[in-house]
A protein has these predicted regions:
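Short alpha-helical transmembrane segments in multi-pass integral membrane proteins
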Residues: 1-19, 77-144, 186-242, 298-363, ...
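Helix-terminus/linker motif at the lipid-water interface of multi-pass membrane proteins
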Residues: 27, 31-49, 119-126, 182-189, ...
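Short runs within selected transmembrane alpha-helices of multi-pass transporters and secretion channels
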Residues: 139-157, 165-173, 194-207, 288-291, ...
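Hydrophobic transmembrane alpha-helices of multi-pass small-molecule transporters
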Residues: 61-64, 176-181, 206-210, 282-285, ...
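N-terminal transmembrane alpha-helices
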Residues: 7-38, 42-43, 57-72, 76, ...
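Transmembrane helical elements of multi-pass membrane transporters/channels
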Residues: 17-36, 138, 172, 201-205, ...
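Residue-level hotspots within pore-lining transmembrane alpha-helices
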Residues: 28, 32, 62-66, 106, ...
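Small-residue-rich hydrophobic transmembrane alpha-helices
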Residues: 49-109, 146-165, 259, 272-336, ...
């Protein structure tokens, strides 16, 4: 059944069958994110909202660490399944699951050990320290659960088990939504309560994911007895996983940089940007879901050397993703004030947040090009292209644009920097993709 999906099913249908569950899980996660932001803002404490916004990049960092073995492992497994090397795929799966657990425990220990220094780097000051520290502590304690969850959620999709991958995300998000108000208000935990609910949701999701791999999968395993992988295979995983991780690390870096630039204009600007970025995630993560949801399809057909089907997959992916990005941009720009008002009904927050949201949205269509291109690089094992794109949009290109635009246009320059970075990165992605397709054509001739 899974082979039919990857090899014979019509491209739009196969792509959507794999991508829609990912998108739906993203939407559920977004609903949680919005509810989380709503409950935090409902406290009415501007310093609390700003404190959580300053520490929010840490959650993205956890996902980045999880991507090392989550996306790196799933890329390797997809290609192995396409090459009909099921036993090698099983070994790779077991290795990635156990190493991600150990890695997560190490990260938790490091984050707790260097808490004071890291909070300082995040830009936490005396006004926000109480709330930021409370939120950070629980996120650090639960880092292992967040990092580990990225592994099984990604590898399940390589076997076509996208629904099971989605279910874990939904279960975790529902737990978050239920316990958010209980911890924040019922137990009077405030910022710490929001983090506690997040960690609890991830723990429950992890339990489900392990069950799904053990009971639903036919070609994957959690058994430590299958952990025998070669150094070459580990290198293959890391060559894709590290660039994939850098993508999210750069997002964390971007958020920290932006917050630090905005701090000079007041905590109200940081609070407004925190809300705007959360809302911006609605479109961004849906686009991410559609881009990376089809990644197993790309990897499988690349491994199977089915050039014709691979080209059809990419054509559909680019056209669909870019059209969706443009639609989201139009809708978000029109309704920006009303959306921001839902979270915090303060005139200055609404005005600043709406402007920030619009500037963030301008580059969505261009971001779509970068997303699909990054997905392809990871799926086909092109570590060089994946690395370049991972350090561009919210890394090297963004930093250069941010410094130039902020010096020339001040506050407005800070806000428009991401959109400018999106355009430049899309051009870089186009060049990389042309080289990949040319190489693929020459290889198959």
């Amino acid at each position: 059944m899974e082979n039919y999906l990857f090899e014979k099913m019509s491209v739009p249908k196969a792509y959507m069958k794999l991508a829609l569950p990912v998108v739906l899980s993203m939407i559920v996660s977004l609903v949680y994110n919005m509810v989380d932001t709503y409950f935090i803002a409902l406290t009415g404490v501007q310093e609390l909202v700003a404190g959580v916004s300053l520490v929010a990049p840490m959650f993205t960092l956890m996902i980045a660490f999880g991507d090392i073995f989550g996306l790196g492992g799933s890329s390797a497994i997809s290609r192995l399944l396409g090459e009909k090397k099921d036993n090698e795929a099983k070994k790779t799966c077991a290795f990635c699951i156990w190493i991600s657990l150990v890695f997560g425990l190490c990260i938790s220990a490091i984050l707790l050990l260097f808490r004071t220094q890291i909070l300082g780097l995040l830009g936490v000051g005396k006004d926000t320290y109480q709330y930021a520290n409370a939120y950070y502590t629980w996120i650090a304690i639960g880092a292992v659960s967040i990092i580990f969850s990225m592994m099984p959620s990604n590898i399940l999709r390589t076997e076509g088990l996208a629904v099971q991958s989605m279910a874990g995300s939904i279960i975790g998000s529902i737990v978050n939504i239920i316990f958010d108000p209980i911890f924040i208000f019922g137990l009077n935990q405030g910022a710490a309560g929001a983090a506690m609910a997040t960690v609890l949701g991830n723990i429950i999701a992890d339990i489900y994911y392990v069950y799904a791999v053990m009971k639903k999968s036919k070609r994957l395993t959690c058994s430590p007895s299958h952990m025998k992988v070669t150094g070459r295979r580990i290198r293959d995983i890391l060559m894709i996983g590290i660039p994939a991780s850098i993508t999210n690390i750069m997002q964390t870096f971007m958020m920290v940089m932006t917050n630090n630039f905005l701090l000079t204009y007041g905590t109200d600007k940081v609070a407004a940007m925190g809300i705007a970025l959360k809302v911006n995630m609605i479109t961004a993560l849906v686009l991410v879901g559609f881009a990376f949801g089809g990644q197993p399809l790309v990897g499988y057909n690349y491994g199977a050397k089915n050039e014709k089907r691979l080209k059809n997959i990419l054509k559909f992916a680019y056209l669909f993703e870019m059209g969706l990005g443009l639609l989201f941009t139009i809708l978000m720009c029109i309704f920006a004030p009303q959306i921001i008002k839902v979270f915090m009904d303060k005139p200055d927050i609404i005005t600043n947040g709406a402007m920030m949201l619009r500037f963030q949205q301008i580059g969505m269509t261009f971001m779509s090009v970068s997303l699909i291109s990054t997905c392809v690089c990871q799926a086909v094992g092109n570590a060089g292209g994946a690395f370049v794109l991972s350090i561009s949009r919210q890394g090297v290109i963004y930093v250069l644009v941010l410094f130039i635009m902020s010096n020339v246009f001040g506050y407005t320059g800070v806000l428009v920097s991401q959109a400018c970075s999106d355009v430049v990165t899309a051009l870089i992605a186009a060049v990389i993709m042309l080289k990949i397709m040319k190489k693929l054509t020459n290889k198959n001739e």
